Amino acid sequence: MGIKGLSKLLARYAPKSMKEGKIDQYSGRVIAIDASILVYQFISAVRDTTGATMVDEFGETTSHIIGTFYRTIKLIESGIKPIYVFDGKPPEMKDGELHKRKENAQKAQEQLDKALEEGDKEQAKKLMKRTARMTKEQSDEVKKLLQLMGIPCIEANCEAEGTCAALVKAGKCYATATEDMDALTLGSEHVVRKFSANDNKKDPIREYSLSSILEETGFTMEQFIDLCILLGCDYCETIKGVGPITAFELIQQYKSIENILQHLSDKYKVPENWKYKEARELFLHPDVADFSDYKLEWNKIDEEGIKKYLVTEKHFNEERVSKGIEKLKNVKSKKAQGRLDSFFNVKKVPLSKSEAASGVKRKKPTTKAKESRKKK
């Protein structure tokens, strides 16, 4: 899920809200990672010219497992403490968008099959990413590995970005690592894109600051949310003919979608039964747990468990897996460890003015990895 054209719009109207950097600048930070985005990257990136992903001897896809293993090791070696957040059940308002994605994926698969049959490698390469999808089984495999590595995993009530944002608001994490810009719309003060422990010279990490966005644009949080709805989100349609710049200028002039609709020219077509109010409510009050008293725990590495899972069950190279485990075990002896001691003392982020005014109270999670569901 994302906000269409938001990054380009911010580059124009709030350029100071984004800064580029390298992974070592996040040493000593706790980062909430949108797990579905990360796993998708591994599934879509590690594919050959036949369209196949990395598989074991039984033909099972394994790129997401080994990719997560080495990426997590690199993050920890960089002095970062990652938390992985997995998607829960999507909101009903997203059903329409999910249906569109399914149809598009089916069309892309048909085009990919044709390109492969014709030997068009360039076209096939372009289509591979559009057909990559993370299954529940793959998600469970990644969770199992992370738990063996001692890394915290949280299954969100709803979408992962909302829970990542809630962790940042509660002061448990510094930033949300995702490619989806709606993490800002959901209230994450810091959002980092291109978050990789690899060499970032060609594609540096990009960090966005929500408070800087609001300061530079002069918008309130509610106005920023309305802007994002006008730009295009997964929860509802947009006004046809209203592009990014027009959307920004309309919010700047009229302050809210309600006022915009009262003054909007007839040349623009407003969707019938437009559910912008419901979309706004989902952004303002996402289905998340209350993390104010939540304690994040990084457990000891289960060395034998990792070997059994990766080598015995998944048939990865034992020597390489052992080297990875040794790197994890040796992190404490590195200089980065001195900075890790401050991880549990992250300051809490206070409620926004709108939340404070409305008396919002966020729900408390259970001590289990999975968030507690709302009581009916």
UniProtKB/Swiss-Prot annotation:
Annotated region described as Interaction with PCNA, given as residue ranges: 336-344
Biased composition (Basic residues): 360-376
Location of this chain's protein in the cell: Nucleus, Nucleolus; Nucleus, Nucleoplasm; Mitochondrion
Alphabetized CDD domains for the sequence: H3TH_FEN1-Euk, PIN_FEN1
Principal place of residence: nucleus
SUPFAM superfamilies: 5' to 3' exonuclease, C-terminal subdomain (SSF47807), PIN domain-like (SSF88723)
Residue numbers spanned by region I-domain: 123-254
Binding-site residues, DNA: 47, 71, 159, 232, 234
Record-listed Mg(2+) 2 binding positions: 180, 182, 234
Database matches in InterPro entries: 5-3_exonuclease, 5-3_exonuclease_C_sf, Flap_endonuc, HhH2, PIN-like_dom_sf, XPG-I_dom, XPG/Rad2, XPG_CS
Disulfide pairings: none
GO cellular component: mitochondrion; nucleolus; nucleoplasm; nucleus
Region feature (Disordered): 354-376
Positions that bind Mg(2+) 1: 34, 87, 159, 161
Entry's Gene Ontology molecular function annotations: 5'-3' exonuclease activity; 5'-flap endonuclease activity; DNA binding; magnesium ion binding
Cofactor note: Binds 2 magnesium ions per subunit. They probably participate in the reaction catalyzed by the enzyme. May bind an additional third magnesium ion after substrate binding.
Subunit-structure text: Interacts with PCNA. Three molecules of FEN1 bind to one PCNA trimer with each molecule binding to one PCNA monomer. PCNA stimulates the nuclease activity without altering cleavage specificity.
Family as reported in the entry's similarity comment: Belongs to the XPG/RAD2 endonuclease family. FEN1 subfamily.
Protein name: Flap endonuclease 1
Organism of this sequence: Entamoeba histolytica (strain ATCC 30459 / HM-1:IMSS / ABRM)
